UniProtKB/Swiss-Prot annotation:
<dbReference type="GO" id="GO:0043066">
    <property type="term" value="P:negative regulation of apoptotic process"/>
</dbReference>
<feature type="region of interest" description="Disordered">
    <location>
        <begin position="92"/>
        <end position="111"/>
    </location>
</feature>
<dbReference type="InterPro" id="IPR001630">
    <property type="entry name" value="Leuzip_CREB"/>
</dbReference>
<keyword id="KW-0804">Transcription</keyword>
<comment type="similarity">
    <text>Belongs to the bZIP family.</text>
</comment>
<comment type="function">
    <text>Phosphorylation-dependent transcription factor that stimulates transcription upon binding to the DNA cAMP response element (CRE), a sequence present in many viral and cellular promoters. Transcription activation is enhanced by the TORC coactivators which act independently of Ser-117 phosphorylation. Involved in different cellular processes including the synchronization of circadian rhythmicity and the differentiation of adipose cells. Regulates the expression of apoptotic and inflammatory response factors in cardiomyocytes in response to ERFE-mediated activation of AKT signaling.</text>
</comment>
<comment type="subunit">
    <text>Interacts with PPRC1. Binds DNA as a dimer. This dimer is stabilized by magnesium ions. Interacts, through the bZIP domain, with the coactivators CRTC1/TORC1, CRTC2/TORC2 and CRTC3/TORC3. When phosphorylated on Ser-117, binds CREBBP. Interacts with CREBL2; regulates CREB1 phosphorylation, stability and transcriptional activity. Interacts (phosphorylated form) with TOX3. Interacts with ARRB1. Binds to HIPK2. Interacts with SGK1. Interacts with TSSK4; this interaction facilitates phosphorylation on Ser-117. Forms a complex with KMT2A and CREBBP.</text>
</comment>
<keyword id="KW-0832">Ubl conjugation</keyword>
<dbReference type="GO" id="GO:1990589">
    <property type="term" value="C:ATF4-CREB1 transcription factor complex"/>
</dbReference>
<dbReference type="GO" id="GO:0046889">
    <property type="term" value="P:positive regulation of lipid biosynthetic process"/>
</dbReference>
<keyword id="KW-0805">Transcription regulation</keyword>
<dbReference type="InterPro" id="IPR046347">
    <property type="entry name" value="bZIP_sf"/>
</dbReference>
<feature type="region of interest" description="Basic motif">
    <location>
        <begin position="268"/>
        <end position="293"/>
    </location>
</feature>
<dbReference type="GO" id="GO:0030154">
    <property type="term" value="P:cell differentiation"/>
</dbReference>
<dbReference type="GO" id="GO:0045600">
    <property type="term" value="P:positive regulation of fat cell differentiation"/>
</dbReference>
<keyword id="KW-0238">DNA-binding</keyword>
<dbReference type="GO" id="GO:0033762">
    <property type="term" value="P:response to glucagon"/>
</dbReference>
Length: 325
């Protein structure tokens, strides 16, 4: 671009100089004659202007630059136009559609290959095995998993009377007595008590206490009858602490309650399974009947086609025999 600007400036200067020289030549009284015109090819280039030699009548030689300039390259450049190929998008869509069609055809072939043939269905119908597998009865949760029963060992409470005797009440209702001065094992005396059922609050519960000699004594439930080794019978009253005074570290354990109606739940589930089996068997029989009817219709059509073909064959044979005769 800088070289083009310089060429344009030199051309303008040459035109100005030529115009001034022409005006000078016209001012002379005599018209100048063209004596010699030389255009040296060796020095002429695309960038240098053409030089003309003009000889005046007085013998003076003047160099005149040519007015016609060679075509210079244009400084203005044409903007570049960017073309976008839309065919590539169309090709990508076509390729995607072709891939989808190939995938659909593969899936269709797989589905057709998985369909059972008429021979296989006919064999299934002729066999005695049921077409629909029966739903096996599941074992109820009550039968499979038995409830876990936790055994909790409760420590035996021991009471000491004012006379120094120890009283231990076991779970079975037996009362063991031991004196303070005797051995714990040899001095034990057992009283068997039969507990009565709980009644309304405010009533006194009586229970039998059996001594070592076989005698039975009727005493209230909150009293203990103790017979000493000497034969004296003493009565002690047991006071139970209220539930609110239980120590915070005591844990009350209770066994889990068994299900109240396991048999009814199992029977209901069994009825539901049997009903589902009956519905499945009914549907299977209906489908078998429809398929057999379809096969019978197809057999009838094939028999008619076979009869028609046999008749056409006979007609062709008769026609061939007549032509041969």
């Amino acid at each position: 671009m800088e070289s083009g600007a310089e060429n344009q400036q030199s051309g303008d200067a040459a035109v100005t100089e030529a115009e001034s020289q022409q005006m000078t030549v016209q001012a002379q009284p005599q018209i100048a004659t063209l004596a010699q015109v030389s255009m040296p090819a060796a020095h002429a280039t695309s960038s240098a202007p053409t030089v003309t030699l003009v000889q005046l009548p007085n013998g003076q030689t003047v160099q005149v630059h040519g007015v016609i300039q060679a075509a210079q390259p244009s400084v203005i450049q044409s903007p570049q136009v960017q073309t976008v190929q839309i065919s590539t998008i169309a090709e990508s869509e076509d390729s995607q559609e072709s891939v989808d069609s190939v995938t659909d055809s593969q899936k269709r072939r797989e589905i057709l290959s998985r369909r059972p043939s008429y021979r296989k269905i006919l064999n299934d119908l002729s066999s005695d095995a049921p077409g629909v597998p029966r739903i096996e009865e599941e074992k109820s949760e009550e039968e499979t998993s038995a409830p876990a029963i936790t055994t909790v060992t409760v420590p035996t409470p021991i009471y000491q009377t004012s006379s120094g005797q120890y009283i231990a009440i076991t779970q079975g209702g037996a009362i063991q007595l031991a004196n303070n001065g005797t051995d714990g094992v040899q001095g034990l005396q057992t009283l068997t008590m039969t507990n009565a059922a709980a009644t309304q609050p405010g009533t006194t519960i009586l229970q039998y206490a059996q001594t070592t000699d076989g005698q039975q004594i009727l005493v209230p439930s909150n009293q203990v009858v103790v017979q000493a080794a000497s034969g004296d019978v003493q009565t002690y009253q047991i006071r139970t602490a209220p539930t609110s005074t239980i120590a915070p570290g005591v844990v009350m354990a209770s066994s889990p309650a068994l299900p109240t109606q396991p048999a009814e739940e199992a029977a209901r589930k069994r009825e539901v399974r049997l009903m589902k089996n009956r519905e499945a068997a009914r549907e299977c029989r209906r489908k078998k009947k429809e398929y057999v009817k379809c096969l019978e219709n197809r057999v009838a059509v094939l028999e008619n086609q076979n009869k028609t073909l046999i008749e056409e064959l006979k007609a062709l044979k008769d026609l061939y025999c007549h032509k041969s005769d």
